[in-house]
Amino acid sequence: MTRESAVATKRNWAILAAGVGLVYVLVRHRHRLLCPLRRVWSFGSLVPQRRIEVINSVQDPTTQWVLNELKNHCQTFKVLGFDCEWITVGGSRRPVALLQLSSHRGLCALFRLCHMKQIPQDLRELLEDDSVIKVGVAPQEDAMKLSHDYGVGVASTLDLRFLCVMAGHKPEGLGKLSKTHLNYTLDKHWRLACSNWEAKTLEPKQLDYAANDALMAVAIYQKLCRDLQPKHFWQRRQLDDNSMHNKFEPFLDVDFTKGFTLNPSGSGVTRSKGSTQSKSNKWVPKKQPYRQIATRTKDFYDNCLLQAPDGELLCTIDRRKASWYLNQNLGTHISEEPFTVRLNFEPAGRAVGDVGRFYQTIKKNQCVVCGDRDAYIRKNVVPREYRKHFPLVMKSHTSDDVLLLCPTCHQLSNISDLRVRSKLAVQCEAPFKQEDGSVKYHDDPQLKRVQSAGKALLHHGAKIPAAKKAEMEKTLLDYYSDQTDITEDLLRQAASVEYRVENSDYCQHGERVVQQYRDHFGGLVELERLWRQHFLHTMQPRFLPELWNVNHNADRLEVRASEGRIDKADLMVAGLDAKIKET
């Protein structure tokens, strides 16, 4: 080999090595390199297409054209950016002045409701169409304002912060979301946000502000959806609209702020799927209205074996329960691995059919949704607020109702449960959360004033100004109409008045729902089936225990009934008495 050819060979190898190194760097850091480009593309691609249409009147020919365009755009992508603007006068909110709707193709329709005598029928239909998702930050609040001010319902609102949590991102306001995910800075100056939206003509800056809010919501939705659809970095594909809608269905029309906390354990969960944020960057609200839930890293299932006297496998149990049988001389230790106990007495029942085989199977210590094994929390598929009101036969031996979820999946599951609770509240007339019927006691304003006046006059009468003192004395004499003078006995009586009175409309949500299903909606197995089906539909678990099924408890009760181990009254409560008679 000549010197020249040797040099050329070395140069070629060097170029090849450099090329391989460059490819490695690009592949290794592809997300860091491509994410800024994708952010710019996500919103930048919509900017040239942006068309702002201002609608001032129902009679305006543009009105129907804009509505037809929005509907056509929703045929291919059933999502609209949604926002509202209004003004406040003297501390009171005026009716919504401006409604903003934006499609994924950049059409931004600004409906000036303050100048329109009525809302067009086609606009009502679009807002009430539950197949079209209206996205934004806190869109439920805007929907409530529209309903209050104009009597129009807005169906299928979706808070973008739910998507942030699902994708492992920090849930923020629209301005910060646009900067974080699209690298676009929205003008959120307070003077612009609080400008006169009822003006005869809106300024160009107002039009940009209003249109960009709605358009940005659609762009952020698209970006977060792509984060939730894993793919190779070289792939570019259309969003699967149907699968996304199914995934988000549990969060439609749900208020993001109702008891939400990204870190439910408060116990230092160190990671969040889909995110590389450090623990210190996790978002936790200042107020946490719910008790904190502890995660566990120790195995939940010990998978010890319990046998009948003849050696037949009955079920798997935890180590503590197995040790209890031994300590009570109710069983004999058979083997150490797996830890096996054989009973010294004949059990009430044996493993029968798939119901029995479910209890015999080995359970894995992992999240049933995603398979994570690092940390998990027990999830009651039928929430305890309902299960605790079930008859004993439907509360005991229901280990199938307890599943393991990782902290992130547990949080998402709890959020999705809010939708079912709200539906049950309406169906069963069982107030939920802060509605009037959920408060057991309320304050009687008159009695509260009487008690306050009595205490003040009794303990601080000499320090109270004459005018205020006279007002308090009048309050007492108006209430105690049979008295003419303020005496110490009267003051003591007033100071001890109980102003908290029982709410005659009070009902406990869980108890009322259980009662209604027991008496009117097919029995408690139907309520169980509702919750278990909801869990399957919303969480789509991929690692459920073998033989787990929606009707497990109903099948278990039927087995017990066939063995004569359940009362007829319990069957009626469960809703199985008619079915048992048929068989």
From Swiss-Prot:
Q: Where in the cell is it found?
A: Mitochondrion membrane
GO CC annotation: cytoplasm; mitochondrial membrane; mitochondrion; nucleus
**Example GO BP:** positive regulation of mitochondrial translation
Residues assigned to the Mitochondrial intermembrane compartment are: 1-11
Identify the SUPFAM superfamilies for this entry.
Ribonuclease H-like
What remark does the entry make about the cofactor?
Answer: Divalent metal cations; Mg(2+) or Mn(2+).
InterPro entries to which the protein is assigned, alphabetical: 3'-5'_exonuclease_dom, 3-5_Exonuclease_domain, RNaseH-like_sf, RNaseH_sf
* Keyword list, A-Z: Exonuclease, Hydrolase, Membrane, Metal-binding, Mitochondrion, Nuclease, Transmembrane, Transmembrane helix
Kindly give the Pfam families that the UniProt entry links to this protein.
DNA_pol_A_exo1
Q: Where the protein is mainly located, per its record?
A: mitochondrion
Phenotype reported upon loss of the gene: Developmental delays and premature female germline stem cell attrition, reduced fecundity, associated with a dramatic extension of lifespan that is reversed with an antioxidant diet.
Q: Which residues bind a divalent metal cation 1?
A: 83, 85, 213
Reported EC number(s) for this entry are 3.1.13.-
State where composition is biased (Polar residues). Answer: 266-281
PANTHER family in UniProt? 3-5 EXONUCLEASE, EXONUCLEASE 3'-5' DOMAIN-CONTAINING PROTEIN 2
Q: What does the record note on quaternary structure? A: Homodimer.
Protein name as catalogued:
Exonuclease 3'-5' domain-containing protein 2
Organism placement in taxonomy = Eukaryota, Metazoa, Ecdysozoa, Arthropoda, Hexapoda
